[in-house]
Design a protein with these regions (language model features):
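Short, glycine-/small- and polar/acidic-enriched structural segments
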Residues: 1-146, 150-156, 169-173, 178-179
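Predominant activation on well-ordered alpha-helical scaffold segments within soluble catalytic domains
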Residues: 16, 62, 116, 160-163, ...
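Transmembrane helix-loop junction
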Residues: 26, 117, 121, 161-164, ...
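Short amphipathic alpha-helical segments at helix boundaries and their inter-helical linkers
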Residues: 51-54, 145, 150, 243-257, ...
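Pocket-lining segment of extracytoplasmic ligand-binding domains
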Residues: 59-60, 138-230
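Ligand-binding clefts/hinges and TM-proximal coupling segments of bilobed small-molecule sensing domains
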Residues: 109-125, 129, 205-238, 280-282, ...
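Secondary-structure end/capping motifs
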Residues: 193-276
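Conserved C-terminal helix/tail region of periplasmic/extracytoplasmic solute-binding proteins
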Residues: 263-301
Length: 301
C-alpha cells in the first residue's frame, strides 16, 4: 500500500510514527510512505491510484470532493487551528498589528484562512493589515528577521526558534476552540468499498500510531526529528508537546462542524457548497467500527 503525506510539518507526525514504529507491518500492511507536497497534488495522486490514502489538508479534500471526486476524510488529525501568530519584538499587543505586514504561505491555504480568522478574533479586519504570500515557514521567519515582515502565522518548531530570536507569540490559536478540519487522513470511497479489510488495517494502525505518539515521547521525538530533518531537539520537543498533548485526539474522528466551516468558506467561490452536507466529505465507518469494538479505549487503559 502507498500512503502519502502532504507537508513536512509537525501536524503530520502521527503518520510518520505509524510507519517508523512498525505498526503498519504489525497489522499486516506493507506500506510505502511518500512525501507529496501540497494538498491538490496529493488529491490528484490519490485519484490516479498512485497512493491509497494521504495525510493532507482538509481544504484540499473538500475542494476535490466538491469537484465531483469521491475523496473523503477517514480520520481527523488536526481538527482545530493549531497555528500561532508570532510578531517582531516591538509588537506585543494585537492593535499594534494594524497597518503592518503579516506573512502566510499562499492565499487560500489553511494558514491563510487561519491568519484571517485570528485577526478577526483579535479585533482586526484582514483589510487593516497587508497579508503577504511568502512560502515556507522558514522563509517567513527569515523575512521577519530581515525586517521585511512584522508578523507571521506558523507552527512549532518555528515558534520555538522565533522565541529564541526575541520574537513574541501573540496568539496560540489552539486555545480558541474553533473547529476547522485542518488536516486528516483521506482516502477514496472506491478504495474503501473494494478493499475494506486493508482499509480497516490502515485505520487500526493509525490509531495505534497516535497512541504511540502520545505515550512514547522520546521515540516519537526521534522520528519527528528525522522527518523534519533537524537536530534541534528543543524545537522538536515543543512540536511534540503542542501536537501530542493539545491537538491530536485519541479517537481521531474528523468533525462535521470542522468540515462545515470549510464548506462555508468554499461557498464564497462555489455557492453550491453551502448546501452540501459535511457528512458527504467523511467516511467514519472504519473508525467507528474500531471504536465500537472497544479497541481504542483498551489502548489507553
Amino acid at each position: 500500500m502507498h500512503i502519502g503525506y502532504s507537508a513536512q510539518a509537525g501536524a503530520f507526525a502521527p503518520i510518520w510514527i505509524t510507519k517508523e514504529a512498525g505498526l503498519f507491518k504489525k497489522n499486516g500492511l506493507d506500506v510505502n510512505l511518500i512525501f507529496i507536497p501540497g494538498g491538490p497534488t496529493a488529491a490528484a495522486s490519490m485519484l490516479a491510484g498512485e497512493v491509497q490514502a494521504v495525510a493532507m489538508a482538509g481544504p484540499a479534500v473538500v475542494s476535490s470532493n466538491l469537484a465531483g471526486t469521491d475523496l473523503v476524510m477517514i480520520a481527523g488529525i488536526v481538527n482545530t487551528f493549531a497555528f500561532q501568530i508570532i510578531t517582531v519584538k516591538a509588537i506585543t499587543a494585537p492593535q499594534q498589528l494594524k497597518g503592518k505586514r503579516v506573512g502566510v504561505n499562499r492565499f487560500g491555504t489553511a494558514p491563510d484562512i487561519a491568519a484571517r480568522f485570528a485577526l478577526r478574533r483579535m479585533g482586526i479586519g484582514p483589510s487593516e493589515v497587508t497579508i503577504l504570500q511568502l512560502g515556507e515557514q522558514s522563509t517567513r521567519l527569515a523575512a521577519m528577521k530581515a525586517g521585511q515582515l512584522d508578523a507571521a502565522i506558523v507552527l512549532p518548531p518555528i515558534t520555538t526558534i522565533a522565541e529564541r530570536e526575541g520574537m513574541n507569540v501573540l496568539l496560540d490559536m489552539s486555545e480558541l476552540g474553533a473547529e476547522y478540519q485542518i488536516t486528516g487522513l483521506a482516502s477514496s470511497q472506491a478504495f474503501i468499498a473494494k478493499n475494506r479489510p486493508a482499509a480497516m488495517k490502515l485505520i487500526r494502525s493509525f490509531v495505534e500510531g497516535i497512541h504511540f505518539y502520545k505515550t512514547r515521547k522520546k521515540e516519537s521525538m526521534a522520528i519527528i526529528a528525522k522527518y523534519m530533518r533537524t537536530n534541534d531537539m528543543e524545537a522538536v520537543a515543543a512540536t511534540w508537546d503542542h501536537f501530542a498533548n493539545k491537538i491530536v485526539p485519541k479517537k481521531p474522528y474528523p468533525t462535521a462542524r470542522g468540515i462545515k466551516a470549510l464548506l462555508d468558506l468554499a461557498a464564497k467561490e462555489r455557492p453550491e457548497a453551502a448546501k452540501v452536507s459535511p457528512e458527504r466529505m467523511m467516511n467514519i465507518s472504519l473508525l467507528k467500527e474500531l471504536d465500537d469494538s472497544g479497541f481504542i479505549d483498551a489502548l489507553y487503559k
